[in-house]
């Protein structure tokens, strides 16, 4: 019989989240819930939410990087909603991806 003193921590591992397995910051479970709730399809593959979470994370990182560049040009310290709104205008691909987004509550001139 093995004593519990020799076996500390052996059976206490916690489940690894899908976001952790894919090394993502965005929650795969929340993306999956949104896809199911939106009824975009009858059935959903296991890797579809993981892929979409990775795409969203990449897009957000790209926009924040461009917003940081806009912020450095205008010389404030904090990234503001205006900087995030103006950032995609410098890149054609990101502009096309974000062109249909509604900036709710943001009222500023370009």
Curated annotation (Swiss-Prot):
The nucleosome is a histone octamer containing two molecules each of H2A, H2B, H3 and H4 assembled in one H3-H4 heterotetramer and two H2A-H2B heterodimers. The octamer wraps approximately 147 bp of DNA. Keywords: Chromosome, DNA-binding, Nucleosome core, Nucleus. It comes from Lilium longiflorum. Core component of nucleosome. Nucleosomes wrap and compact DNA into chromatin, limiting DNA accessibility to the cellular machineries which require DNA as a template. Histones thereby play a central role in transcription regulation, DNA repair, DNA replication and chromosomal stability. DNA accessibility is regulated via a complex set of post-translational modifications of histones, also called histone code, and nucleosome remodeling. The keyword Nucleus applies. Expressed in the generative cell within the bicellular pollen. Not detected in other reproductive or vegetative tissues. The lineage of its organism: Eukaryota, Viridiplantae, Streptophyta, Embryophyta, Tracheophyta. It comes from the Eukaryota. One of its GO terms (cellular component) is nucleosome. GO terms for molecular function: DNA binding; protein heterodimerization activity; structural constituent of chromatin. This is Histone H2A.1. Belongs to the histone H2A family. It is found in: Nucleus; Chromosome.
């Amino acid at each position: 019989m093995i004593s519990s003193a020799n076996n500390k921590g052996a059976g206490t591992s916690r489940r690894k989240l899908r976001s952790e397995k894919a090394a993502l910051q965005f929650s795969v479970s929340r993306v999956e819930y949104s896809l199911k709730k939106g009824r975009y399809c009858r059935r959903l593959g296991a890797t579809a939410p993981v892929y979409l979470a990775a795409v969203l994370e990449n897009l957000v990182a790209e926009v924040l990087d461009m917003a940081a560049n806009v912020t450095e040009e205008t010389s404030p310290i904090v990234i503001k909603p205006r900087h995030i709104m103006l950032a995609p205008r410098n890149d054609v691909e990101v502009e096309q991806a974000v062109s249909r987004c509604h900036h709710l509550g943001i009222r500023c001139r370009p």
